[in-house]
């Protein structure tokens, strides 16, 4: 190794071979350090801002006092102790694997205590959502589903898949159902195979919605032909959920406060019009 070699040629072969300095310096012309300009500063600022936005979100840490001292949990692990599972964001294979693992763990602890699943998802991959759905139906625990924010596409299917009577939503959430979408490329035969597969998935999803909403297949097909957005009250009438909650039971209350459907005022009776001759 040649210590002392600098790109700028200020110090070349400074230790053992000083005679090589002029020769090597001729091949490495002096370079000035880049000057800091306004454009460079703005570019650096934009780069740092983009890096910060791509960084993973911070997960809060909960510290609890125990008889053996302090114990720290990340917030999702602490909620898991209370049998709460969060399905947040797009549903893909990684989210499905985490949710399935939590469901199986909670069943191993007790197969009778309910599991609370909070959903705020725009949907995602159909096969990943069906993996969560099948696990929900497989385990023995009753599952309470809660819609916070939105439950769209596969999110609405998971919301409807909760135990009957235990499917909830907060009053300002949005629910959306639609038919599956996808694309295919390649040879004509391959495209035909993909089209046949997505049609099978479409019928499979229709049957699942019909099972949990108690609607006929004709009603489901008509509702899911295009994006169908619903308020919590509309989703309750459709059969996707059972209750729209304002807040949990307070002291002295047996049941949580529900959003009541506003009564429709009857139109005033029209006065009879005298017959004209």
Swiss-Prot record:
Principal cellular location given in the protein's record: mitochondrion
Tree of life domain: Eukaryota
Region ranges (Disordered): 246-277
Gene3D superfamilies assigned to the protein according to its UniProt record, in alphabetical order: 2-enoyl-CoA Hydratase, Chain A, domain 1 (3.90.226.10)
Disulfide topology: none
One of the Pfam families matching this protein, by short name: CLP_protease
Active site positions, chain numbering: 153, 178
PROSITE patterns: CLP_PROTEASE_HIS, CLP_PROTEASE_SER
Composition bias, Low complexity: 265-277
Residues with the N6-acetyllysine modification: 211
Record CDD domains: S14_ClpP_2
MF term (GO), any: ATPase binding
N6-succinyllysine PTM positions: 200
Transit peptide location: 1-56
SUPFAM superfamilies according to UniProt: ClpP/crotonase (SSF52096)
One annotated GO biological process: protein quality control for misfolded or incompletely synthesized proteins
UniProt subcellular location: Mitochondrion matrix
One GO cellular component term: endopeptidase Clp complex
EC number: 3.4.21.92
Keywords: Acetylation, Deafness, Disease variant, Hydrolase, Mitochondrion, Protease, Serine protease, Transit peptide
Catalysis: reaction(s): Hydrolysis of proteins to small peptides in the presence of ATP and magnesium. alpha-casein is the usual test substrate. In the absence of ATP, only oligopeptides shorter than five residues are hydrolyzed (such as succinyl-Leu-Tyr-|-NHMec, and Leu-Tyr-Leu-|-Tyr-Trp, in which cleavage of the -Tyr-|-Leu- and -Tyr-|-Trp bonds also occurs)
Similarity section: Belongs to the peptidase S14 family.
Disease as annotated in the protein's UniProt record: Perrault syndrome 3: An autosomal recessive, sex-influenced disorder characterized by sensorineural deafness in both males and females, and ovarian dysgenesis in females. Affected females have primary amenorrhea, streak gonads, and infertility, whereas affected males show normal pubertal development and are fertile. A spectrum of additional clinical features, including cerebellar ataxia, learning disability, and peripheral neuropathy, have been described in some PRLTS3 affected individuals.
Oligomer status and interactors: Fourteen CLPP subunits assemble into 2 heptameric rings which stack back to back to give a disk-like structure with a central cavity. Component of the ClpXP complex formed by the assembly of two CLPP heptameric rings with two CLPX hexameric rings, giving rise to a symmetrical structure with two central CLPP rings flanked by a CLPX ring at either end of the complex.
Function, in words: Protease component of the ClpXP complex that cleaves peptides and various proteins in an ATP-dependent process. Has low peptidase activity in the absence of CLPX. The ClpXP complex can degrade CSN1S1, CSN2 and CSN3, as well as synthetic peptides (in vitro) and may be responsible for a fairly general and central housekeeping function rather than for the degradation of specific substrates. Cleaves PINK1 in the mitochondrion.
Protein name: ATP-dependent Clp protease proteolytic subunit, mitochondrial
Source organism of the structure: Homo sapiens
């Amino acid at each position: 190794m040649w210590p002392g070699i600098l790109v700028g040629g200020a110090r070349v072969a400074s230790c053992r071979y000083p005679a090589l300095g002029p020769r090597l310096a001729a091949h490495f012309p002096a370079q000035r350090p880049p000057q800091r300009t306004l454009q460079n500063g703005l570019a650096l600022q934009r780069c740092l801002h983009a890096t910060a936005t791509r960084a993973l979100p911070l997960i809060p840490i909960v510290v609890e006092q125990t008889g053996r001292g302090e114990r720290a949990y990340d917030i999702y692990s602490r909620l898991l102790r209370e049998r709460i599972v969060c399905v947040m964001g797009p549903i893909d294979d990684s989210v499905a694997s985490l949710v399935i693992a939590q469901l199986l763990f909670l069943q191993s602890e007790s197969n009778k205590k309910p599991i609370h699943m909070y959903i705020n998802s725009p949907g995602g991959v159909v096969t990943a959502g069906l993996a969560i759905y099948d696990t929900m139906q497989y385990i023995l625990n009753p599952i309470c589903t809660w819609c916070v924010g939105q439950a769209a596409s596969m999110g609405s299917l998971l919301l409807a898949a909760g135990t009957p009577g235990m499917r909830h939503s907060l009053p300002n959430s949005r629910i959306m159902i639609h038919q599956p979408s996808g694309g295919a490329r390649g040879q004509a035969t391959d495209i035909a195979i993909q089209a046949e597969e997505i049609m099978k998935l479409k019928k499979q999803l229709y049957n699942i919605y019909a099972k949990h909403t108690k609607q006929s297949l004709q009603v489901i097909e008509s509702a899911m032909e295009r994006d169908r957005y619903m308020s919590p009250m509309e989703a309750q009438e459709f059969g996707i959920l059972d209750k729209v909650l304002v807040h949990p039971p307070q002291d002295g209350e047996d049941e949580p406060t529900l959003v009541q459907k506003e009564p429709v005022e009857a139109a005033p009776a029209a006065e009879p019009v005298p017959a004209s001759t």
